[in-house]
């Protein structure tokens, strides 16, 4: 199945000059959604991981379904002040400024093998922050899966030290 057929380009969203990749038509098609989740789940099973980690918000949509399909733990990565208990915090750079990602300190166990799932790989800033959070937790990222790879925003070999799945490339 060609998942690209279920992604709609929205010009000038969320701001002028941006072409937003809208995945809601994919989520709204039961066959496409099932195919996407099954494909990511098969990748996760091959990695033999302990836990799935994902950032908000759309990463949660994919990763929670994959965690269910693979019977794996699911750990949230969130922006500041969204997690109620003690957290690890990593600052990372955005195009104009910085942001933070956080994870509960006790959610990952030392030596946990982790796969990170997110909807879009753009510059890699969010993913690098998540890798840093996993390392602070003394766990190990072994792979990552992206629904969409915006190849024009990063180097071709970005994250080549990991097993990486990319379902749609632009």
Curated annotation (Swiss-Prot):
InterPro entries: Ade_phspho_trans (IPR005764), PRibTrfase_dom (IPR000836), PRTase-like (IPR029057), UPRTase/APRTase (IPR050054). It catalyses: AMP + diphosphate = 5-phospho-alpha-D-ribose 1-diphosphate + adenine. It holds the Pfam family Pribosyltran. It comes from the Bacteria. Pathway: Purine metabolism; AMP biosynthesis via salvage pathway; AMP from adenine: step 1/1. PROSITE patterns: PUR_PYR_PR_TRANSFER. Its main location: cytoplasm. Belongs to the purine/pyrimidine phosphoribosyltransferase family. HAMAP family: Aden_phosphoribosyltr (MF_00004). Catalyzes a salvage reaction resulting in the formation of AMP, that is energically less costly than de novo synthesis. This is Adenine phosphoribosyltransferase. It comes from Mycoplasma capricolum subsp. capricolum (strain California kid / ATCC 27343 / NCTC 10154).
């Amino acid at each position: 199945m060609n998942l690209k057929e279920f992604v709609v380009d929205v010009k000038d969203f969320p701001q002028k000059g941006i072409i937003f990749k809208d995945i809601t038509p994919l989520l709204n098609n039961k066959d496409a959604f099932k195919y996407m989740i099954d494909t990511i789940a098969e990748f996760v099973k091959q990695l033999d991981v302990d836990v799935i980690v994902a950032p908000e918000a759309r990463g949660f949509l994919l990763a929670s379904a994959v965690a269910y399909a693979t019977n794996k733990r699911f750990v949230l990565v969130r922006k500041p002040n969204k997690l109620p208990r003690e957290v690890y915090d990593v600052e990372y750079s955005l195009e104009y400024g910085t942001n933070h990602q956080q994870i509960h300190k006790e959610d990952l166990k030392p030596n946990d093998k982790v796969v990170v799932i997110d909807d879009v790989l753009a510059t890699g800033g969010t993913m690098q922050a998540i890798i840093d959070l996993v390392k602070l937790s003394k766990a190990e990222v072994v792979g990552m899966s992206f629904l969409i790879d915006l190849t024009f925003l990063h180097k071709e070999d970005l994250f080549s030290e990991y097993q990486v799945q990319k379902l749609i490339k632009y």
